[in-house]
């Protein structure tokens, strides 16, 4: 399949590389030309613009930071689109924004899917991402061979915007989960109990989770190297809260978690991994 790929950051670069490994013909574009070099070295073609990335391709994928970026690149995609093109955005944006962008592309004759992912940099590199897709059955069928190169758990959640709803729900669970593990560790340490032993005990019971297993170990190792930056999780939780406000939905746990991530960014931890919420808790409780 001929695929254009736009956005080559922490997530986009390994995702595009996995498409190349799957024997797809990949054309890449990124705002920073140097981001394209690893893909060009691996056999991808370079594009001069989003429109150029769309031209002559069957599928175009974007993996960028936020809704304005998605809207901008998709306007370019529409300019370079050929009949039958499917455009897939795998970024995390608000469901309402995904629906709006989808409607704009439909007016230009482009079928659009929102297909955000979960699994972080590790999953992107391994090709084991969870992919949550929203859009038509026909678009999903066209995009699925590409999805299978990038992920293992691939779910067509529903119509346009449904993928972003699922991703927002994912961010609620993961945000609270990371905060819960960090609070448990802060609680243990303040009581003079070894955090590693507490984690070991919890892993054998009903408190087990992948977050406790994987991120808990990284907290113990003080490894805050970003696989998913705190400012990005803050952005995602703000999407949750904005959508909840629009719907008149009460989400007290999400609200508290969002405030913690807002505080992380405000205190200079935005470029570190989301598990650096442990650092914030340590500062607030006199453990730093």
Residue ranges and their predicted role:
Residues 266-288:
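NAD(P)-dependent dehydrogenase/reductase Rossmann-like domain
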Residues 31-32, 66, 136:
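Residues in the short beta-alpha loop(s) of Rossmann-like NAD(P)-binding domains
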Residues 92-175:
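Rossmann-fold dinucleotide-binding core
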Residues 50-111:
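Rossmann-fold NAD(P) dinucleotide-binding segment
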